[in-house]
Amino acid sequence: MVYSKYMWSVKGYENQKLFLDNAFVNNKLAHAYLFTGSDRETKKQLAIEFATMILGVSEEEKERINPDLIVIDQSKMKIEEMRALISELSLKPFRYQKKVAIIQNFEDVTDEAASSILKTLEEPNNSSLIILLSRNQKSLLPTIVSRCQSIYFNIHFILLIFNCW
């Protein structure tokens, strides 16, 4: 088995981590990623670690507030909040080369909010990257799914691995 080059704190999901590593190392980052699956906490942790890798955040800086990393963790995100995020992503990064936005529970955003981010996904800004987290991509607009690089996280596979030990 080939292992990731980055020192991820999350155990398991070696193929997903290797895929993200390769995209980063080869400068082939997508403008948007969709992390799907039932393992909510792991998706969030991997998204944050991937974002800090992209930004080049040092170990000492990880605990500090970072204006170039936006993590939204709320249900039923409304169109006004999505527009504010889109506006923030259109601004130049404060410290790093990119701004990264992570939106958790994307399946719970309002239809209007989901539609409003579509233009940003269709016409990406080179200085921003979006990571959407969702339990099931079938609950999302197909046009949003088609604009993102999808990565699936299956908790049952990880539980199977741990049960084999």
Report the location of each language-model feature.
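Conserved Walker B
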Residues: 105-109, 137
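Conserved D-loop-proximal element of ABC-family nucleotide-binding domains
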Residues: 111-112, 142
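Short glycine/proline-centered loop/turn elements that form peptide/ligand docking sites
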Residues: 78, 115, 135-137
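Conserved adenine-binding aromatic site and its adjacent loop/helix in ATP-hydrolyzing domains
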Residues: 87, 119, 146
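P-loop/Walker A NTP-binding region and its immediately flanking N-terminal helices
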Residues: 1-103, 129-131, 142
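Conserved catalytic/switch belt of AAA+ P-loop NTPases
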Residues: 90, 115-132
